[in-house]
Every structure is written in structure tokens, then in C-alpha cells.
């Protein structure tokens, strides 16, 4: 674990963050301190950022551009469970336009992405089917690249995922077990 003394004060455009939970590609935590010229973030704000695979200490430094604000009505469990797969589901739903009442088949090798994409399609009025359909929404590399194309798109996508969580779109989708996701006390 990294102690408070070994993590320096944040510099220009950098945030010092205290992680609270990690899962499915994202870490959620709170702002511990904000460096000069950081706009929109203050100490104790809830935030999320992409997990880089590194060991996470008690405090970490991240560029402000790599951090997303988390609304107060979204839990840590919802962020780590739904944000990553939700961004992919959002991109998949946007790849093929469909209308209310259309039959849609969802194809993904990731069961959680398939379940979340189906839930999102149903919330937009589609009938999700396992057989022949008006169109198929396929989880492929091109669609996933749309998710990671840039921070502006990531931030915009995160807002839509958080709104879908608030509307209850993913209520039927089981979250990640929180006991395996905790990173800090």
C-alpha cells in the first residue's frame, strides 16, 4: 500500500484520488486533493477512472482529463459493475438503428455485455429475441473502439450510462460481488 507521505501533492491539472472500489475496467473513489488548474473537481467529490492494471495504493495521482465525475445517486457497486459494460452496450445499441417494436438479437461473447445491451434495447422499445430478428447487434472490435476513442466521448457515454442506471435499465442485471472489488477501507 502507498502511504499518504509517498504520494506527492498534485501538480498542474492533476488530482490525488483515494480509491474505494475496483471492478470490470474501472476504479471508483474520491478526490483527496486537486492540483492547480483542475476544473470541476473538489476534495471529497466521487469520481471514476479506467483501471490500468497496476497495483492501487491508498492514494493515486491521475490527470484530470482521465477522471469522470460520479453522480451522488450512483453507488460504488453500480459504477464498478455497470460502467465498463454499459459503455460497450451503449456503443452497440448506437451501431444499428432500430425502432420501437423491432425484433433485435444481441450477440456478444461477454454474457454481461449481452445482458446489458439487451436491457438497453428493451428500454428503447425493442423486443429482444434469440432467433431470427429484424437486426442483430454484434459485439465486435469496431464497436468497442468507439468506447475508447477519446475522453469527450467517454465522458458523454458515462453520463448516458449513469442516466440508464437511474432509470432502472440495468435493475435486472446482477452487479459484481462487492467483497471482491474493495480496494481500500
What label would you give each PLM region?
Residues 24, 28, 82-86, 114, ...:
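Short alpha-helical patches at coil-to-helix transitions and adjacent helical residues
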Residues 122-123, 127, 131-132, 142-152, ...:
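NAD(P)H/NAD(P)+-dependent Rossmann-fold oxidoreductase cores
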Residues 6-54, 108, 132:
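Glycine-rich beta-strand-centered segment in the early N-terminal region that forms part
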Residues 4-10, 151-185:
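C-terminal hydrophobic helical "lid"/dimerization subdomain
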Residues 83-142:
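Mid-domain Rossmann-like dinucleotide-binding core that forms the NAD(H)/NADP(H) cofactor-binding site
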Residues 47-109:
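NAD(P)H dinucleotide-binding glycine-rich loop of Rossmann-like/cofactor-binding domains
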Residues 28, 86-89, 158-161:
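A general structural signal for well-ordered alpha-helical segments in protein cores
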Amino acid at each position: 500500500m502507498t502511504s499518504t507521505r509517498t504520494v506527492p501533492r498534485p501538480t498542474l491539472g492533476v488530482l490525488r484520488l483515494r480509491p474505494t472500489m475496483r471492478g470490470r475496467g474501472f476504479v471508483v473513489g474520491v478526490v483527496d486533493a486537486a492540483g492547480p488548474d483542475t476544473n470541476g473537481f473538489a476534495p471529497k467529490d466521487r469520481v471514476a477512472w479506467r483501471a490500468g492494471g497496476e497495483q492501487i495504493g491508498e492514494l493515486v495521482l491521475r490527470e484530470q482529463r482521465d477522471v469522470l465525475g460520479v453522480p451522488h445517486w450512483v453507488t460504488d457497486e453500480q459504477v464498478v459493475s455497470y460502467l465498463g459494460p454499459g459503455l460497450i452496450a451503449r456503443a452497440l445499441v448506437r451501431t444499428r438503428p432500430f425502432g420501437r417494436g423491432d425484433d433485435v438479437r444481441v450477440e456478444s461473447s461477454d454474457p454481461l455485455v449481452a445482458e446489458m445491451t439487451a436491457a438497453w434495447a428493451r428500454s428503447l422499445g425493442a423486443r429482444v429475441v434469440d432467433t431470427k430478428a429484424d437486426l442483430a447487434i454484434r459485439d465486435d472490435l469496431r464497436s468497442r473502439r468507439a468506447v475508447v476513442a477519446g475522453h469527450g466521448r467517454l465522458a458523454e457515454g458515462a453520463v448516458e450510462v449513469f442516466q440508464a442506471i437511474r432509470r432502472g435499465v440495468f435493475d435486472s442485471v446482477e452487479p459484481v460481488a462487492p467483497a471482491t472489488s474493495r480496494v481500500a477501507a
